[in-house]
Amino acid sequence: MDYQHIRYEIHDKIAVLYLDMKDKSANVLSQAMLAELEQVITELEQISGLIGFVMKSAKPSGFVFGADILEFETLTTEDEVRALQENAMRCLTKIETSHLVSVAILHGPVLGGGLELALACDWRLCQQTGRIMAGFPEANL
């Protein structure tokens, strides 16, 4: 299946996922990215012999900057907010409960939902290039 924001390759028994928000300089967890990520994990779980996946950013700017706050501006009802939260939790739970071993390769900003995504993985590794900035800035929103 073709995806807009994620591509992956399989090397031996490991899938390498590249997060790459189309037409953006940085990755954010938009509803489209979350839906694709959930679909990709489901697809990978069906591949016989696959034992795990590595998730990394294809962007030099960093791993994932967090939720797509521009989407927040479009929410007008409590039900829409709840649906957005439930979609995010479903995706993170999919990663946490997958039988596949998951590894997040981190660099640059790993903020808010991006940090939650990294924490949903079994392992987190930091690239030696550059710096890591991890945290939950939404406490200030």
Regions found by a protein language model. Give the residues of each.
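Conserved CoA-thioester-binding segment of acyl-CoA-metabolizing enzymes
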Residues: 1-56, 93
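Short, histidine-centered active-site or binding-site loop motifs used for metal coordination
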Residues: 19-23, 76, 138
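Secondary-structure transition/capping motifs at alpha-helix termini
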Residues: 47, 95-98, 126-130
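Glycine- (often His-adjacent) and acidic-residue-rich active-site loop
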Residues: 57-90, 110
